[in-house]
């Protein structure tokens, strides 16, 4: 599993608590070196590694991104979506089985005053279907505006 935008390692922690270490190999990536430092000292084990970066270094069965693209570094929606699509394309190249990511959504793409990116679900699906193939979405009623996108090879 590659976890892009791993932050403080919440997904690694979840896997550690719910699976035996022989059941998974996890590699967390983040562009923030402080997050990687924190995770590298918190999580010890041959099956868990952390690296500075924004994409996997090798093929992985699953590439996940949870909340990775919610905080935009620009107010320019087209620029942010170009960045998002470029990152998704790079990650897809390393996904052997599936790529899974979530985004905040609204009827029209926008970036809030707090720099939270809200995607138009149809725009994301159209991009993913045209570049990667059939794309499924999951909505959880308890997470308003959150949509998880899954693309399986």
Predicted regions span which residues?
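Class I S-adenosyl-L-methionine
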Residues: 112-153
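Short, conserved SAM-binding segment of the class I
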Residues: 83-90, 94
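Class I SAM-dependent methyltransferase SAM/SAH-binding core
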Residues: 10-49
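Short "lid" loop at the C-terminus of a central beta-strand within the Rossmann-like core
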Residues: 69-71, 104-109
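Conserved beta-strand signature within the Rossmann-like core of class I S-adenosyl-L-methionine
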Residues: 95-103
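Class I SAM-dependent methyltransferase "Motif I" SAM/SAH-binding loop
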Residues: 5-9
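A short SAM/SAH-binding and catalytic strip from SAM-dependent methyltransferases
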Residues: 62-81
């Amino acid at each position: 599993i590659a976890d892009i935008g791993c932050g403080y390692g919440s997904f690694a922690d979840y896997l550690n608590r719910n699976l035996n270490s022989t059941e998974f190999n996890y590699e967390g990536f983040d562009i923030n070196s402080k997050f990687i430092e924190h995770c590298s000292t918190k999580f010890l084990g041959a099956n868990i590694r952390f690296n500075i970066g924004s994409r996997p270094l090798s093929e992985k069965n699953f590439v996940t991104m949870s909340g990775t693209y919610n905080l935009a570094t620009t107010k320019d929606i087209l620029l942010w979506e170009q960045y998002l699509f470029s990152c998704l394309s790079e990650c897809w190249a390393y996904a052997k089985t599936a790529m899974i990511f979530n985004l905040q959504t609204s009827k029209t793409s926008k970036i809030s005053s707090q720099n939270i990116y809200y995607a138009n679900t149809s725009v994301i699906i159209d991009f993913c279907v045209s570049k990667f193939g059939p794309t499924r979405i999951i909505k959880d009623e308890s997470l308003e505006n959150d949509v998880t996108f899954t693309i399986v090879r």
